[in-house]
């Protein structure tokens, strides 16, 4: 499958899009994408995911009403990612003491997503 086919499948809701990291950037992305695509919103923080499922936006970026209305599938279960073909990694990249980015979360999220990639999958990094 090529990128054009994947885009068509996403639009037809035959393939799923996953947003990995549901903080200030990832949560509003997931909510907006879910207006047009089947979206898996993944975060390793189970308490945060439970709040999102209850319609409570702990980031203040998307809003409680948007969370209550969204079709986004919020989860902290890694195995849910096996159903995705398009991934957006949106995890923190804080600065180290020497003003270089700390890529620990990016590397961990990359390894997590890599376990669920299939031929033709697409990964986008949003930082």
Where are these regions (language model features)?
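Structural/interface elements that position substrates and couple domains in central-metabolism enzymes
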Residues: 1-127
């Amino acid at each position: 499958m090529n990128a054009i086919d994947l885009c068509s499948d996403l639009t037809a809701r035959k393939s799923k899009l996953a947003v990995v990291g549901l903080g200030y950037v990832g949560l509003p992305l997931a909510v907006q994408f879910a207006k047009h695509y089947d979206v898996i919103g993944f975060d390793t923080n189970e308490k945060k995911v439970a709040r999102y499922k209850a319609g409570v936006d702990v980031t203040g970026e998307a809003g409680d009403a948007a969370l209550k209305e969204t079709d986004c599938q919020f989860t902290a279960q890694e195995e849910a990612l096996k159903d995705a073909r398009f991934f957006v990694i949106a995890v923190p990249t804080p600065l180290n003491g020497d003003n270089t980015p700390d890529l620990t979360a990016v590397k961990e999220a990359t390894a997590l997503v890599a376990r669920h990639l299939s031929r033709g999958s697409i990964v986008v990094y949003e930082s």
